[in-house]
């Protein structure tokens, strides 16, 4: 973790923040940039520090109106870069809705692409004056995930034989678990697997992200998990954690 004296929670104006997001999207994914520009032009992105009614601890939301094929994004951005990761995360949801033809059905991997975007946006920030915030945000993501896995270990070891039926998953022994656990764990793992490939094996990443976007919203969660495999997800997660440690030590 970055010492407090190194991490600087830099202030940024809305205008510069939108430019930063735009520059990142232009470099990372032109198709996503087009969606982002459309949301901005049609005033479907709202930045506000106000808490959402009924969602006190939520930092951002992305609404999908399937029959209209529209998305709306809310972000509790407070002009500090410690909240700068929220909008890219929610834009990841907007992009996933777009690629799945605005399929708004529950999916256990719904957070995977947005978590991946968090890491890649962080990598982009590491080459800017906002590097301290990038490392801190990445630490918070990894620390939250590892703490969750430790707390939910008993549930995690049952995932091998899971069968999904929202809002629960059913294991081979007949026990029932809340699907939120599986969603948070597996979405993080797939997001970090994609992150590792994007950083170190771009050809394989291009293939895997293409498959994921083709499967999402069109096949079952089990089929997606079977394709990527728990072994690959675990290895990708471990390597992403190690990469953070190695990069910071430099």
Residue ranges and their predicted role:
Residues 81-86, 104-112, 177-185:
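Short, conserved micro-motifs enriched in small and acidic residues
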Residues 1-72:
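Contiguous, non-catalytic segments that form substrate-binding/exosite surfaces or channel walls
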Residues 20-31, 90, 94, 120, ...:
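Generic, well-ordered alpha-helical scaffold segments in large soluble proteins
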Residues 100, 104-149, 187, 228:
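Post-HExxH zinc-binding segment in Zn-dependent metallohydrolases
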Residues 86-90, 94, 98, 112:
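Catalytic glutamate of the conserved HExxH
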Residues 121, 161-250:
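C-terminal, non-catalytic "cap/extension" segments appended to globular domains
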Residues 133-171:
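Amphipathic alpha-helical blocks and their helix-capping loop/short-beta junctions
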């Amino acid at each position: 973790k970055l010492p407090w004296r190194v991490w600087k929670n830099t202030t940024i104006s809305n205008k510069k923040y939108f430019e930063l997001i735009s520059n990142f999207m232009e470099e990372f994914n032109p198709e996503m940039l087009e969606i982002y520009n459309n949301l901005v032009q049609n005033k479907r992105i709202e930045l506000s520090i106000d808490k959402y009614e009924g969602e006190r601890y939520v930092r951002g939301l992305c609404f999908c109106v399937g029959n209209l094929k529209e998305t709306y994004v809310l972000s509790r951005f407070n002009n500090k870069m410690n909240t700068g990761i929220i909008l890219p995360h929610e834009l990841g949801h907007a992009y996933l809705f777009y690629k799945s033809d605005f399929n708004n059905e529950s999916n256990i991997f719904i957070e995977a692409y947005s978590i991946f975007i968090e890491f890649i946006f962080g990598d982009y920030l590491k080459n800017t004056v906002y590097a301290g915030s990038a490392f801190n945000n990445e630490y918070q993501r990894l620390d939250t995930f590892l703490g969750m896995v430790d707390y939910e270990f008993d549930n995690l070891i049952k995932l091998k034989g899971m069968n999904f039926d929202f809002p629960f998953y059913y294991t081979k022994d007949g026990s029932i678990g809340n699907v939120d656990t599986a969603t948070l764990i597996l979405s993080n793992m797939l997001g970090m697997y994609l992150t590792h490939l994007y950083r170190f094996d771009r050809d394989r990443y291009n293939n895997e992200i293409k498959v994921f976007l083709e499967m999402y919203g069109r096949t079952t969660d089990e089929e997606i998990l079977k394709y990527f495999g728990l072994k690959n997800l675990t290895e990708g997660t471990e390597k992403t954690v190690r990469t953070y440690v190695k990069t910071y030590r430099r």
